[in-house]
Amino acid sequence: MLKPLGDRVLVEIIEEAEQKTAGGLYVPDSAKEKSQRGKVVAVGTGKTLDNGTKVAMEVKEGDTVYFAKYGGTEVSLEGKNYSLLSERDLLAIVE
């Protein structure tokens, strides 16, 4: 598994169910919108400010989050898709 550095978060992308058009045609993966929801599987230690103070992360492992559509770096590990994001690219935590 990857250990994010600083204020980065590793999010396992939650794949959406197979999509079908009103006419009954299946939408291929290449035509689907990129998923914007995932489960946090690892977090960094937090952001370090210029004065050396460490800012704690707001998210924790296990949180379900929404993130910026084109934010982060996509990573595939052990057959699963992940996104490595800065905490600022996270939009919301699902409660």
Curated annotation (Swiss-Prot):
Keyword Cytoplasm: yes
CDD domains referenced in this protein's UniProt entry, alphabetically: cpn10
GO biological process terms, semicolon-separated: chaperone cofactor-dependent protein refolding
Keywords, sorted A to Z: Chaperone, Cytoplasm
Source organism, top-level taxon: Bacteria
A Pfam family it matches: Cpn10
Keyword Chaperone assigned: yes
A molecular function GO annotation: unfolded protein binding
Gene3D superfamilies given in the database record: GroES chaperonin
Location(s) in or outside the cell: Cytoplasm
Gene Ontology cellular-component annotations: cytoplasm
Family in the record: Belongs to the GroES chaperonin family.
Role noted for this protein: Together with the chaperonin GroEL, plays an essential role in assisting protein folding. The GroEL-GroES system forms a nano-cage that allows encapsulation of the non-native substrate proteins and provides a physical environment optimized to promote and accelerate protein folding. GroES binds to the apical surface of the GroEL ring, thereby capping the opening of the GroEL channel.
Subunit structure: Heptamer of 7 subunits arranged in a ring. Interacts with the chaperonin GroEL.
Name of the protein in question: Co-chaperonin GroES
Organism whose genome encodes this protein: Deinococcus radiodurans (strain ATCC 13939 / DSM 20539 / JCM 16871 / CCUG 27074 / LMG 4051 / NBRC 15346 / NCIMB 9279 / VKM B-1422 / R1)
